[in-house]
């Protein structure tokens, strides 16, 4: 559950534009000016908090203008945030741009792009697999192929996995399919997906800051695939960049009078291409487009732990959210119950006073700080009696605590690296550390002594949804670690670092 007290930046007032991370911002307005009752946004925030959902940011775009925005400290407007599977919608858009440039069509056979990688005994279903089947998660495989491919020869091993069903007839959420789309774009263009998107999509949208994790050594000896973005995950963007992407699709591919993405592509990507009735949650069984989910209302790209780009054409609205929750359906339930009914009206509510109250609330959001005392019951600096040796997978520990301005300086050790971070008392202290050569991690930490020999630190990896609660028993030197939501992949903080080679 989140609390709402901090000195995080307030929402920008109406009119004017801001610039976060060098990107020209969307126009700003107020909810009443765009026909929305500010109380509906407040009810949404209340409902999410009641469901104990941890939001990190929110941006609501109504009739083309931002009418509500907020970041829960230590998250900030300019900060990049891992999108997880929301990345897929950007990969599909790269395919759409390549289709518009006549580099391929959605009816091209997947094997046609990789003649040297096709097994001699290729399965007939693989031989008939089309680009559209990858886009719509209808490759025919019953299970995600990602865990079954050879990470050193991704394309060949994917093409060696026989689908159980005829392509185009069976929906399975398949990260391997999106990885193949990334490989196709890279093979055709000679560029990784991120670099292909920069001049065609990101820069025209004013998005200058983006990072996409690559797959090391997955090319199988193919020089055209040496720089391969994950495609299915790994893209990091600021919240406003997510909102701009949604607004582009809401506007049928037009941005400031320029058709950046073909209208036909937007239409096809955002309508049902395959049914998915076996999905358990109501907003995940409304059908699937080209790497977009259909919802009970509108459509969306989304990623693990609550990264959302929700597009609602019927009410001319886009909602961008970043979060850390395993209950993504709860967020959408709150959208439908609290926000959507108000969006169906043009009633601005009680006017500017209510709007000012909402902006004040959005300006002081924070995640919970560590609670306790500033003074230790032991002499500092404190050092663990036995520094980490033979680090165990998935473990993180505090190896030293020393006093510093506004708090402490902590030495942390995980299975991959040892590094020092600042830790604030009753505030968030930010650090950027090089966890190993060429890999940098942005951290914000808050700490306190819960008793004379127990130190607790909240350590947020602020370019991701993930935060560690570290509790150090200085009497024994032991540390317990608990994630808010555990990363999908290696569960050590250093594994979440940006690798400069991927920039």
What are these regions (language model features)?
Residues 40-76, 316-320:
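A short, well-structured edge-of-sheet supersecondary motif
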Residues 222-223, 227, 267-319:
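Active-site Gly/Thr loop motif
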Residues 82, 101-139, 160, 188-232:
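Active-site helix/loop module of the DD-peptidase/beta-lactamase fold
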Residues 5-8, 303-369:
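Structured C-terminal helix/loop/strand segments within mature extracytoplasmic catalytic/sensor domains
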Residues 64, 81-107, 134, 181-185, ...:
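Active-site SXXK
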